[in-house]
Amino acid sequence: MTILAIAAAAWILLHLLVAGALRPAIAGRIGENAFRGLFSVLSAISLGFLIWAYRGTPFVPLWDLGIGAVHMAKLLVFIACFLLVGSLTPRNPNLAGAELVLKDTLPAEGLIRVTRHPMLWAFTFWAIAHLLANGNLAALLLFGAILVVALNGMYSIDRKQHRRHGAAWDAFAAQTSLVPFLAIAQGRNRFVFREYGLARVIIACALFLILMYGHGYVIGRDVTG
């Protein structure tokens, strides 16, 4: 369990410190592109270490929320699939070049109308789902670490984009929201289904089925029941 705790701490500190407070100094010395490449490699290594440590950790039960929590977990994964697929769009300034997207008067479209961080919300719901369905210490360390990084990432990206793009980012942020559907509820935007598209709905549903039926083969635990 100690190794898993170290791996979880390393994963969190990598994202909170290296991608946070230390990023300007490091990127200033090696360049932004080199930093992105280095951080991607370090993230992959850290995630691999985290997963490896998790698989070798003994089972220590903490809670059992019953079958209702399992069904809720499946619903959250289903929603996460739609968020993940919807985030993979060239109109997402957090994935594509923000300068190209933010130059438009109305850059928020598709799922970005719902939240400006659909991918990180997908990881958030995915992590919560696994915490609901796996009430043990190892799961808490693994999925808790992923949850912390995903939630912190939303605020970190907002701060970073504001520093880089100033008024252009503020205008974009005013059209959307960090919390899903908040901008729509406040009348600052509206959801347009055709911008999400039937193709993405089909892909999201297919992804969910692949995750459900492939879970037993890859992870060794059947979740289709």
What are the functions of these language-model segments?
Residues 1-13:
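Hydrophobic transmembrane alpha-helical segments in integral membrane proteins
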Residues 209-225:
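Juxtamembrane boundary at the C-terminal end of a transmembrane helix
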Residues 112-167:
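A contiguous pocket-lining binding segment that forms or flanks enzyme active sites
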